[in-house]
Structure formats: structure tokens, C-alpha cells
Amino acid sequence: MDKTQLKRHDLVYPSSIGRARLKQVFLNELTGEKAFLAADIFRVDSVIPGIVRRAEVLSADVIPLGFVHPQLCEGRRLRLTAELEVGEAVKLKRPYELAAAEFKVSTNCLAAAQAVCSYAAERRLKLGILGSAGLEIATGLPFTNSESDLDLLITGLSLQQLQEVYTELQAIGKKFQVDIDLETELINGYGIKAAELFQPTQTVLGKSLQDVQILKKKTVVEILSQEA
């Protein structure tokens, strides 16, 4: 796997060797229910991927990932940060692929996701599914519940187009009583909350795998126009 091609929110699947190694790492660090859930995440036959995350300093042959178990532990998700060796990664899946996948609707969050995917397909939008909904679509495991929000990723739209799509997505969210959060992905690797672009400010917060920066909104709008 070419690590340089990875972007925020990408799903990376470890090999059986990688899972076995990470399982041992966390069994040495955790106890009780947390150790049990960690062992489940890193079972050889587990379908739970890691989510690419930002890390301060890492060698070139390591991929920083975050793993989540669908079961709550002490009232919250068990979130584990891990370092996977590049050679231990066997599959990559981008959030945009999840929007084209078939999935069972078990919660309002996924019902909203289904409606959003249909809307995006009709308009040929490049839209991706993130967060708990993305993990449930990717794995078939119950990551969403009655309180889940729907996190989305989109690219290839000008500011005006983005605002039109954002309005439609908020209407879908209202219909299913689900909060929808939309992030736009720029070609330079930065992700920006769409809602920030519509606020009367001169700057927005941009997040990439390398850093977090305050970006000039004018510059971001120019990039969006070039990508549309």
C-alpha cells in the first residue's frame, strides 16, 4: 500500500498478522472489558477497519489508525489509537465507496444516509459517509443508534453548489430527525466543515493528515471554484 495516497477518513484493513500483533499490544496494556473489546476488534476474522488519523511524528513505514468497537464500554465507545506497519495493510476503502454500497437500514441515522445516498446518486455528487454510519455500512455491525449523527464528506463543488447541497442535506436530516454534518475535502488534502464556509468570517479551520491550519476563506473559495 502506498502510504502517500492515504487521506483523512480512509478505512484501512489490517492483515491477520497485523491484527494479531495489535491484539497482543492492547492485551498487554488493557484489562477487563476494555481488553475483551480490544481483542474482539483485532480478531483474525474481524471486519473492523482502522480509520486513518493524524499523528505528530511517525516513520515512513507506519500508518497511524484509530479503531472503534460498536459496543459501548462504560457508556462510551472504546477508541484505540494504533500504528500499523505499511506491509500489514491489505485493503483501503475511501468514504466515497461507502455511499455506493448496499446496506440495511436499522436506525434513523442509516435511513437518512440512504436518502442522502439516493440524492447524491441522482445528482452525480461525489459524496462519502463517515463516522458511525460509515463504519456500520463498511462492516454490517451496529455502530449507529438512536442518538447517532450523520457525518458526510463531499468534494468537487463550488461554494454556491456546496451551499445548495448543504441546504438539501439539512432538509433530509430534519425529515429523519438526524443532525447532518458535512465536510468538504479539498484537493490539497485539507478538510473543512461546510457550515464554517457560510459564516461571516474571513478564515476557516482546515484539517489534514499533517496539521491543522487557519486558512483564508478567500483562498478556499478559489480552490473550490477550480475543483468544481
Q: Across the structure, where does each feature detected by a protein language model lie?
A:
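Flexible, glycine-rich phosphate/dinucleotide-binding loops
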Residues: 74, 136, 189
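Active-site nucleotide-donor binding segment shared across nucleotidyl transfer reactions
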Residues: 117-150, 154-160, 169
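Polyanionic, low-complexity intrinsically disordered segments
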Residues: 220-227
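Mature, function-bearing regions of proteins
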Residues: 87, 202-220
